[in-house]
Structures are given as C-alpha cells and as structure tokens.
Amino acid sequence: MHATGLAAPAGTPRLRKWPSKRRVPVSQPGMADPHQFFDDTSSAPSRGYGGQPSPGGLGYPPSSSDAAFLAAPMSNMAMVYGSSLAAQGKELVDKNIDRFIPVSKLKYYFAVDTVYVGKKLGLLVFPYLHQDWEVQYQQDTPVAPRFDINAPDLYIPAMAFITYILVAGLALGTQDRFSPDLLGLQASSALAWLTLEVVAILLSLYLVTVNTDLTTIDLVAFLGYKYVGMIGGVLTGLLFGKIGYYLVLAWCCVSIFVFMIRTLRLKILAQAAAEGVPVRGARNQLRMYLTMAVAAAQPVLMYWLTFHLVR
C-alpha cells in the first residue's frame, strides 16, 4: 500500500472500489429525518398528552365549562326576548278583544256557584213568594251573582240554551225526525229570535229616552232565562204527552212573566220606583208599556220555539 500523496507506479494494477455495504437510513413518509435533532412541528398536527391528536389546536382539550359559560347567556337572552314577545302579544290581543267583547265584564256574569244556581232556578219557577228584588251594591259596584240572587248572570242562560238544543234533538229523535240540518235550524232560529229581541228592546229604550243602567249583557241574561221553562215544558211533553206539556209550559210562562215584570221595573222604572211616585206622565206610561211588552213576549216565544217538538 502506497503512502498518501504519491502516485502509483506504472504497471501497478488499480484496485476497484466496491460500494460500501453500510446502510444509509432513508426517511419514510410520516417519519422524521434521522439527521434532524428536533421534530418539525410547523406542519404536523399538534399532539396532546399521550400522543393523541388534540382537537383544541393548542394541546389542551376544550373545556365543557367554557362552552356552558358561553351558551348560558345566549339561552337566557332568548328566554327573556321570547317572554317579552309573548307578553306584548297577549297585551295586544286583550286590547283588541276588549274593543268588541268586554271580557272583564263577562267574568262578573259567570261568577256563580252551586248554591246560587239552585236558588235562581227556584226563583225562576216560583217567583211569587220572593219579596226583595233589588240588586245589592258594594261601593257603587254590583256584587257578584253568587252573593246576590237578584243579580243577572250568563251561566244559567248559556247552559239552558245548550240544554234546550239537546232536548230538541232528543224530541226530534223520538219522532224519527232528527237530522243535523233540522237541529241546526232549531239553534239558529232560537239565536235569531234572541238577537231580534235585544235589538228591538234597545231601539225602544232609545226612542223612549230611558235613562237606565240596563246593559246589553243584562238584556241577554234576562231574555235567556226563558229557556229554563222551555226545557221543562218539552221534557214533560216527552214523558206525559201534550197535556203535561201545556200544563208545565203554562206555569213556566206565568212565572217568567212575573219574574220579568218585577225585575225590569227596577231597571226601566228605577227612578219612579225609588221615589215611590205614581206612574202618571206620558213618558213613564211608555216605559211601563215597554216593560209589559218585554215580559209578555217571553211566553209567546216559549210556545213558538217548542210547540212543534211535542206531538
């Protein structure tokens, strides 16, 4: 072997260098360079503890308390906003309804109980022994019907009207004449007559110039009491025939006539009745005639709306 830096003598064969069998590490995809001291984390996804990829992006898992903290104010704001919208909508609906239907006033006419209903039904059938017909007041406001039997209510007229329609359907069914159209005609005719009565009385009060505290709802209540006698007459007619129908209906007609006279005279003739002055003037005469006409119309309508139901 020759020293370094000296050329090999001529004729000496040159040795062939074979490639070294030492392995050179080759980097595989997904593996770090073996000659690199530190891992390149600029493009690789961050890893949390244990080598698992972290969805948070900073090596820490997202905290559930942070998400709840952010979601709570949003939900509270949504609830407050929704409740405010509901309150505004309710207020708007109440105002629009009160323009046409006095809901607050209607609550007064349905303030009844079982004792009142029983006493009022007895008064409608037997009004002859009742003495005190004046409505009681408390601080210039009439007391609720459940505390005063003389106060008008809408519960009995409404229930009586519905019951009358059901009894009419029963009567038509026993005679093999029932049909939905005929029952609807019965209900619509009863409502039409009631509406006509109210309009006629209000127009008459306007023409006679009567200053009274009788309201439209009071009129509907008083005029609706006649359905109680109509129910009794039709049921008796179904059980005992026409004789029973005429007897019971006649009694109920007289009773409702007396009831209406004694009730309306305190409404239409309130000033004259309070002062005890005899009704002699022309205007008071008209008021008395109006009271008599309203009371007399009740028996006529009671017969007209029920006579065809009993055969």
UniProtKB/Swiss-Prot annotation:
Compositionally biased residues, Gly residues: 48-57
Modification Phosphoserine, positions: S64
Topology of the protein relative to the lipid bilayer: Multi-pass membrane protein
Annotated knockout phenotype: Homozygous knockout mice lacking Yif1b show impaired visual perception associated with retinal dysfunction and optic atrophy while no ventilator defects or increased susceptibility to seizures is observed. Some deficits in fine motor skills and coordination are also observed. Mutant mice have delayed cerebral myelination, enlarged ventricles, and cerebellar atrophy associated with a reduction in the number of Purkinje cells due to neurodegeneration and necrosis.
Modified residues (N-acetylmethionine): M1
Location of the region described as Disordered in the Swiss-Prot/TrEMBL record: 1-57
Residue numbers bearing the Phosphothreonine modification: T12
Cytoplasmic compartment segments: 1-153, 211-216, 260-289
Role played: Functions in endoplasmic reticulum to Golgi vesicle-mediated transport and regulates the proper organization of the endoplasmic reticulum and the Golgi. Plays a key role in targeting to neuronal dendrites receptors such as HTR1A. Also plays a role in primary cilium and sperm flagellum assembly probably through protein transport to these compartments.
UniProt subunit comment: Interacts with HTR1A (via C-terminus). Interacts with ABCB9 (via TMD0); this interaction allows (but is not essential) the ER-to-Golgi trafficking and strongly depends on a salt bridge within TMD0.
Protein name: Protein YIF1B
Taxonomic placement: Eukaryota, Metazoa, Chordata, Craniata, Vertebrata
Protein's gene: Yif1b
